[in-house]
UniProtKB/Swiss-Prot annotation:
Protein name in the entry: Secretin OutD
Location in the cell: Cell outer membrane
InterPro entries: Bact_Secretion_Sys_Channel, GspD-like_N0, GspD/PilQ, NolW-like, NolW-like_sf, T2SS/T3SS_dom, T2SS_GspD, T2SS_GspD_CS
Record-marked site positions (May serve as a pivot that allows opening of the central gate for substrate egress): 511
Residue ranges of the region described as Secretin: 401-648
Coiled coil: none
Gene that this polypeptide is encoded by: outD
Domain notes: The N0, N1, N2 and N3 domains are periplasmic, while the secretin and S domains form a channel that is partially inserted in the outer membrane. The N1, N2 and N3 domains each form a periplasmic ring. The secretin domain forms a double beta-barrel structure; the outer barrel has a diameter of about 110 Angstroms while the inner barrel forms the central gate with a small pore in the closed state. The S domain interacts with pilotin OutS.
Location of the region described as S domain in the Swiss-Prot/TrEMBL record: 691-710
Major subcellular location class: membrane
Length: 710
């Protein structure tokens, strides 16, 4: 045995070191005894024996007294060193470079204490920090209990991090290991068995809310949360799901069964004032939730007044070039009140009603048209369900402003030139495409010479003929020259706009009522009796918008542009007037605020007729005296533009109205400045900054529209 000792005037130190021989080296054992020794001297002695570099904080002062009767190896000797310092309020903090720092224990919390884990938990009185996750217990609730078991006055501390539900514990390794064992024992899954309680009379949502409110009251009265059951309502099956500790679960189930009892009062009556929906319409929807009965005396279909399914605007006796707009909306106040239902509600104050059966319970729903309200008599649970349905249906429906541009251009060029000859003895050359046959002219002239009157056929031919006709009638010879060059244009321009509710059909109609002869008969007194019907011609626009997801609008369109054919048209006959009709029936999907071309037509018709006398008509120069030529070229262009704008609130509606008024007012002022008080349709505008002009539409088809041979 090798002995080593240090003696001071204020104390003594004895230390014995044993070196055990082995083939590879020596193993050291230590025995220590200190009495009244300066603590810094004690630290220096241990540092020298363990061959460690130790930094001593200046605040480390005092004397120690300790004695060891057993022999210790290096590990035990180091733990003995840590325990002595812990008793006197000091701690050792190891550094990354192997240096040890001796500081006061209360200052060690902010030092770089090693992070321990299950593989390296630390030994004895070493300072360590552990991060312990919790799975079943709230770290916030467990942390205060663990602080009481740790050395909070010294280097120990316990904090929790609620977002991750973890504990952060710092202290002596042995103490922290004991705290971790306690946490693992407490953090276990409790009894979470679930029980489903079906309800017969009560509402699952109401029962679950009531039981949870009682649990919150118990929690405030310091009842542990583990002793409370979790209660969740299943509205689909009208049942309540209960989970938790067995005793808490049994208490909750018993409470639920006590609440699920048949009510003495089977029903109540409530008046619900609607804000936007129509009471008569909602009756049909609510009646679809149950089995309809025939107990009520009045049927909703019989007493329901005929309500228009769409908003409409019309104008008659107007010119083709026009623009107009119309809108419709509805609103009403909202409130509800409970009241008794007696004979005060007779057939004069309510219109329409149904008695239906929902979940085996009788429900009566009536509509009061004057106040746009519903009178419902139903059990409380059914009443709540109906109120939820009504609140979801009684909403402000968005509106759609539909703006259209209808541009139609017609151009017709015609040429009619011919010469007809006649001889009373030799015959005649007659061409029917000239408008006046020479035979009619000769017979009419003979009668006029004899008695001074015209034949009916001659008078009719002259009244319907346009152009120049000239000739001579001398002796047996007569000649008739007819000439007509026509150039007609017809422009139909309109910018109708209409506002309608979502999924509501709207109609715009601007036109004239044109009389059409449908029959004629002669009475016994030789009076002619005519039967006349009137046909509407003009511009008709019928649209039904449907707002879809993503602010897209599905437009169902029915558009018609009709007019009376020109009197010079070849399609006109003595049977009556001819109508030009263009119809578009379509459905398109348009994004809110975008313009779409719904339909278009580019049409060209050419008719040419050449009549001549054989051989004579082919003679150069002189052949023109024996020919008749008729030529007609018609071109027609029709385009229809639509632009929907969704209006969801009154502010957007007001803005759209102001923009329309300003556009109209500016055009009116401009026309008045030019000396014309009536707006022309050379410029067609859509709101939102998009402008389309008649000339732009015309120029886009200019290649097709160029006149030929002119």
């Amino acid at each position: 045995m090798l002995g080593k000792g240090i003696k001071k005037s204020w104390g003594w130190l004895g230390l014995t070191v044993l070196l055990l021989g082995s083939p590879c080296g020596w193993a050291a054992e230590f025995s220590a005894s200190f009495k009244g020794t300066d603590i810094q001297e004690f630290i220096n002695t241990v540092s020298k024996n363990l061959n460690k570099t130790v930094i001593i904080d200046p605040t480390v002062r005092g004397t120690i007294s300790v004695r060891s009767y057993d022999m210790m190896n290096e590990g035990q000797y180091y733990q003995f060193f840590l325990s002595v310092l812990d008793v006197y309020g000091f701690s050792v903090v190891p550094m990354d470079n192997g240096v040890l720092k001796v500081i006061r224990s209360k200052d060690a919390k902010s030092s770089s204490i090693p992070l321990a884990n299950n593989e390296q938990p630390g030994i004895g009185d070493e300072l360590v920090t552990r991060v312990v996750p919790l799975n079943n217990v709230a770290a916030r609730d467990l942390a205060p209990l663990l602080r009481q078991l740790n050395d909070n006055a010294g280097a120990g501390t316990v904090v929790h991090y609620e977002p991750s539900n973890v504990l952060l514990m710092t202290g002596r390794a042995a103490v922290i290991k004991r705290l971790v064992d306690i946490v693992n024992t407490v953090d276990k899954t409790g009894d979470r068995e679930m029980v489903t309680v079906p309800l017969t009379y009560a509402s699952a949502e109401d029962v679950a809310k009531l039981v949870n409110d009682l649990n919150k009251s118990d929690e405030k009265n310091a009842l542990p949360s583990t002793m409370l059951a979790n209660v969740v309502a299943d509205g689909r099956t009208n049942s309540v799901v209960v989970s938790g500790e067995e005793n808490a679960r049994q208490r909750a189930v018993e409470m639920i069964r006590q609440l699920d009892r048949k009510q003495v009062v089977q029903g109540g009556t409530k008046v619900i004032y609607l804000k936007y929906a129509k009471a008569l319409d909602l009756i049909e929807v609510l009646a679809g939730n149950g089995t309809s009965g025939n107990r009520n005396s009045s049927s909703s279909n019989a007493s329901r007044p005929s309500s228009p399914r769409s908003g409409s605007s019309s104008n008659s006796n107007s010119s083709s070039g026009s623009s107009g707009s119309s809108s419709g909306s509805s609103s009403s106040s909202s409130s509800s009140s409970s009241m008794g239902f007696g004979s005060a509600f007779g057939s004069t104050s309510s219109s329409g009603g149904r008695t239906i059966t929902i979940q085996g319970k009788e429900v009566t729903v009536r509509a009061h048209d004057q106040t746009n309200s519903l009178i419902i008599t139903a059990p409380p649970d059914i009443m709540r369900d109906l109120e939820q349905v009504i609140n979801q249906l009684d909403i402000r429906r968005p509106q759609v402003l539909v703006e259209a541009i209808i541009a139609e251009i017609q151009d017709a060029d015609g040429l009619n030139l011919g010469i007809q000859w006649a001889n009373k003895r030799a015959g005649m050359t007659q061409f029917t495409n000239t408008g006046i046959p020479i035979s009619t002219a000769v017979i009419g002239t003979d009668q006029f010479r004899s008695n001074g009157t015209l034949t009916t056929a001659y008078a009719s031919a002259l009244s319907s003929f346009n152009g120049v006709t000239a000739g001579f009638y001398r002796g047996n010879w007569s000649m008739l020259l007819t000439a007509l060059s026509s150039d007609s244009k017809n422009d139909v321009l309109a910018t109708p706009s209409i506002v309608t509710l979502d999924n509501m059909e709207a109609t715009f109609n601007v036109g004239q009522e044109v009389p059409v002869l449908t029959g004629s008969q002669t009475t016994s007194a030789d009076n002619i009796f005519n039967t006349v019907e009137r046909k509407t011609v003009g511009i008709k626009l019928r649209v039904k918008p449907q707002i879809n997801e993503g602010d897209s609008v599905l437009l169902q369109i029915e558009q018609e542009v009709s007019s009376v054919a020109d009197s010079n048209s070849s399609t006109n006959s003595s049977l009556g007037v001819t109508f030009n009709t263009r119809t578009v029936n379509n459905a398109v999907m348009v994004t809110n605020g975008e313009t779409v071309v719904v339909g278009g037509l580019l049409d060209k018709t050419s008719v040419e007729s050449n009549d001549k006398v054989p051989l004579l008509g082919d003679i150069p120069w002189l052949g023109s005296l024996f020919r008749s030529k008729s030529q007609e070229v018609r071109k027609r262009n029709l385009m229809l533009f639509l632009r929907p704008t969704i209006i969801r609130d009154p502010g957007q509606f007001q803005e759209a109205s102001i923009n329309k008024y300003r556009s109209f007012n500016n055009e009116q002022q401009q026309q008045r400045g030019e000396g014309n008080g009536v707006l022309d349709n050379n410029t067609l505008r859509l709101s939102g900054g998009n402008t389309y002009t008649f000339r732009q539409v015309q120029s886009s088809i200019s290649d097709f529209y160029k006149p030929e041979g002119r």
